[in-house]
Each structure stands twice: as C-alpha cells, then as structure tokens.
Amino acid sequence: MALIVQKFGGTSVGSVERIEQVADKVKKFRDAGDDLVVVLSAMSGETNRLIDLAKAISGDQQPLPRELDVIVSTGEQVTIALLAMALNKRGVPAVSYTGSQVRILTDSAHTKARILQIDDQKIRTDLKAGRVVVVAGFQGVDEQGNITTLGRGGSDTTGVALAAALKADECQIYTDVDGVYTTDPRVVSVAQRLDKITFEEMLEMASLGSKVLQIRAVEFAGKYNVPLRVLHSFKEGPGTLITIDEEESMEQPIISGIAFNRDEAKLTIRGVPDTPGVAFKILGPISGANIEVDMIVQNVSHDNTTDFTFTVHRNEYDAAERILQNTAKEIGAREVVGDTKIAKVSIVGVGMRSHAGVASRMFEALAKESINIQMISTSEIKVSVVIEEKYLELAVRALHTAFELDAPARQGE
C-alpha cells in the first residue's frame, strides 16, 4: 500500500463529466489499497473569469492583491467539493479542504506567495480513518489568516509540497499529455515519450519553454527528493517518472530532449565605452524594472568600445528597449538595435557530463541546414543557441535526428 498525492489540472476537472471521470480514476487507486491525497485546480477558464470580474469592478485601478486572492481562491473550492461528493457517491469516503483549512502556511506576498510550512496532522488523521483527502491547489494562508495564492501553476507546487510534507511514495501530475517527450510532438512527429528523466534535466526543460511542469514544482520536488510522475488524465499508461537518479547505460542517449522558446527578443547596444562596470550600467536599470535577462554576449573590445547583446522575453522587449535607449545616452554609446524575430533552441541531457564534442555535434547539425547561430549559452547539462525564428522548427527536427532521438519507424511504415 502506497501513499500517493495526485494533482489534476483545470482541463481534467473542466466539467462535471470530467470530475466524474477523475472520481473513477481515484476510486481505482483506492480500491487497490493506496492512501490518496488529491489536489485540484479550478475548472479550466474559471481563474481567468474571476480575475476579469475583479478587473471589471476595479475600473481603472489594479485589483487589490489581497481581495484578488480571496476571489480567485474560490475556483478551487468548487472543484474540491464536487470531487468529494462524486467520491462519496461511489462509496469512497472523502473530505475536501481549502488551503487554509489544512494550514498550508505561506508568506504574505499576495498573488505570488511561497509555501513556508504545511501542518500535515489533519490530513494524516483523515487518511488513517480511511478517507481520501481532496485539497485545493494554488492557495494557502499567511500568519495573519489572510488567504494567499501561489501564482500561475501553483497547484503543481501544492501537490509537490504536500507530497514532501507527507513523505509520499509518489506525486502524480495528471495533465493533457501522457508524459514528457523528447520534444514537442507537434513539431517533431517522431518525438518519443521518456520513461524517466532527472530533476536536473526536467528543470532545464521547464525553464527553457517546456510547458509540461511548472519550474517551481520541479525545484520543490528536487529539493525534497519527491518522485514525480507525469500522466495523462484520461488515458492509461506509465507516463514519465522524474527522479534524482542518473542511470548510465550503453543504450541511454547523450541528450534527453530538445527544448525551444519562440518568446525571445534580442537587444544590442553598440559602441559602448569599454570601461569597468559598464555591464552593470547597462543591465542594472533593466533588472531594476524587473525585466529578466537571459543570454548575454559582449564582443571583444575594438578602439576602446564594445557591443553588448542580451535577450529578454518578447513581451518585455518594448520596455527594455526604452530603458536601453536612455542608458545609451547616459554612457555615450553609439546606438541601440533590436530583433524580435529570434528563437532559442536548446539540447538538454545529463549525458553531456561524460561525453565530449556534444556542442560541436549540435553546431554541425545546424550548419548542415544552413542555420546561422547568433548567440550561444552553455551549462553542465545544456547548450542553447539563438537563431532566426523562421528556422526554428527545421532546427528542432535536425537536432532531434542528429542526436538519435527519433522514434524507430514501425513495421509497414
């Protein structure tokens, strides 16, 4: 008998019919003898509807963060109560709790709170009594008793945090895909589902644009060594297990996956006086505006001037460009140029640690397709490049093939 935390997202509980299906799935596990804690999101689209209501009543002002948390947290209350009802109807004793009722204690950063502590006694008492415990994801309570929410993707984090607090055997994340793939199957039809991947690799892929799991949830799972499994909500299958283990084998590919991100933009400030502290003068104001910088390249100095290039999220390009224009005037740079038609492609794999020449193999594959590399960034288990956006899908397919990630052709194909 195992203790399992299961998390179902908004699509999985998007209607009464789907909640009934989730109840059937939970019952199967309960009938097999497992203890279950189930974490739910609000119905698909419900959080946005509640936010729109708050915006409508607030007019020209931003909704008050505290009150926004109060209204948004009601979405999960609906789904947890409905699932508890559906389970009891099936003869499965179940009880639902909000984040505050099970004392998911957070800081007071409304709309983006972080979990500090979980009091697991109430849940353990119910589990011991044979009940399935259904908990609202995405929310908690601060020391003053105020309702807080954890930000987008917070339900994944709730699931992992509960699994860590309860020392669960596994945290299962149910979604609309049947696991983690070597890359997006919509781009590469021969992408393969991974049976297993490390926390490190999953964290890199999540940070590079993979939408399967939220970064905070993966970080939490890695920190507390919570085995994560990504599964399809309504299809049977083993899914993908995410663990701390690195199993070396002769058959194991060097690269686990190809990640990509279309939401990149590039800014270059040219003719920058090459003096100590110039990087801070350029990036300090950008950071001060809470704009996250990704890749950075500084050219070799020529005539005591240099060019400085960095990438930001495309949504923040205009704000970053305005700041950079002001900086250019202040430091005496020649000009600012930008490009929003770029994309980032990355190869990820712990196998890089023990294999030389991985980056050159990547560059060779792109060169064969006449794809120019504009920027390069590396880490211990990742190599990222910036290219023209129009070549993105070609690059992903070429790299997927070059690193032997393509699924073998079925007989008769």
UniProtKB/Swiss-Prot annotation:
GO MF, one example: aspartate kinase activity
Locations listed in the record: Cytoplasm
GO cellular component, one term: cytosol
Disulfide bonding pattern of the chain: none
Metabolic or biological pathway, per its Swiss-Prot or TrEMBL entry: Amino-acid biosynthesis; L-lysine biosynthesis via DAP pathway; (S)-tetrahydrodipicolinate from L-aspartate: step 1/4; Amino-acid biosynthesis; L-methionine biosynthesis via de novo pathway; L-homoserine from L-aspartate: step 1/3; Amino-acid biosynthesis; L-threonine biosynthesis; L-threonine from L-aspartate: step 1/5
Keyword check for Cytoplasm: yes
Keyword Nucleus among record annotations: no
Keywords for this protein: Allosteric enzyme, Amino-acid biosynthesis, ATP-binding, Cytoplasm, Diaminopimelate biosynthesis, Kinase, Lysine biosynthesis, Methionine biosynthesis, Nucleotide-binding, Repeat, Threonine biosynthesis, Transferase
Signal sequence region: none
GO biological process: diaminopimelate biosynthetic process; homoserine biosynthetic process; lysine biosynthetic process via diaminopimelate; methionine biosynthetic process; threonine biosynthetic process
Catalytic activity: L-aspartate + ATP = 4-phospho-L-aspartate + ADP
Major subcellular location class: cytoplasm
Domain ACT: 267-341, 347-413
EC number(s) reported in the record: 2.7.2.4
Matching SUPFAM superfamilies: ACT-like, Carbamate kinase-like
Activity modulation notes: Activated by L-lysine, L-methionine, and L-isoleucine. L-threonine, at low concentrations, is a mild activator and has a weak inhibitory effect only at concentrations over 10 mM. Strongly feedback inhibited by the concerted combination of L-lysine and L-threonine and slightly feedback inhibited by the concerted combination of L-threonine and L-methionine. Activated by the combination of L-methionine and L-lysine, L-methionine and L-isoleucine and L-lysine and L-isoleucine.
Family: Belongs to the aspartokinase family.
NCBIfam families referenced in this protein's UniProt entry, alphabetically: asp_kin_monofn, asp_kinases, PRK06635.1-2, PRK06635.1-4
Subunit structure as annotated in this protein's UniProt entry: Homotrimer. In the presence of inhibitory amino acids the Stokes radius of the protein increases, suggesting its oligomeric state may change.
Function description: Involved in the biosynthesis of L-aspartate-beta-semialdehyde which is a central intermediate in the biosynthesis of different amino acids (L-lysine, L-methionine, L-threonine). Catalyzes the phosphorylation of the beta-carboxyl group of L-aspartate to yield 4-phospho-L-aspartate.
Protein name, UniProt field: Aspartate kinase
Organism field: Pseudomonas fluorescens (strain SBW25)
